[in-house]
Amino acid sequence: MKRTKSIHHASFRKSWSARHLTPVALAVTAVFMLAGCEKSDDTVSLYQNADDCSAANPGKSAECTTAYNNALKEAERTAPKYATREDCVAEFGEGQCQQAPAQAGMAPENQAQAQQSSGSFWMPLMAGYMMGRLMGGGAGFAQQPLFSSKNPASPAYGKYTDAAGKNYGAAQPGRTMTVPKTAMAPKPATTTTVTRGGFGESVAKQSTMQRSAAGTSTRSMGG
């Protein structure tokens, strides 16, 4: 009898714990999940230039101009660099490349190497930029330069991509989208020249990773 009574008590304690602790655990988990979502995403707008931004944000012309100019400077620092104009044009299309400033992120030995081959090095024009609120709730804006290819053979053709090759959809300014906060973080400076087709390979790899991540997320949500 004592043994049976003991078993009943143990069963009662287990049942009580399951009833009373599980909802608390679930609630705590939900709070952390919501907090994680709030910290991981940012809403940004995509513009081609400062005029597009000003038209969409009356009264914010100064902020739009500042963000655009900062994006241009960031593009000079982080855009893929090519030793020759031909390599850049093969990747981004005719009329989409420019000579990069001498100190645009390149290490001295790489500058010398590029300049020996073509007199300078080349980079794609900034096709647009993302603009969002500063991390931490600051009053200013964060920006990220975007690039796009006019060469149909390139994986970046008709798309907005950042300096790392991540794809943000069709190269259509005026859109608003949600991106991870890491998307607006400064990218590392370009310190070496890219071989012909190298940036396109990066875009293709990033697109594959994005599709894989999206598929994993969908399967997880669906059980």
Swiss-Prot record:
Instruction: Give the residue ranges for region: Disordered.
Output: 178-223
Against Pfam families, the record matches this protein to:
DUF1190
Q: Where is the composition biased (Polar residues)?
A: 204-223
Show the ranges annotated as biased composition (Low complexity): 178-195
The family annotation for this protein states: Belongs to the UPF0441 family.
- Protein name, per record: UPF0441 protein YgiB
Organism of origin is Salmonella enteritidis PT4 (strain P125109)
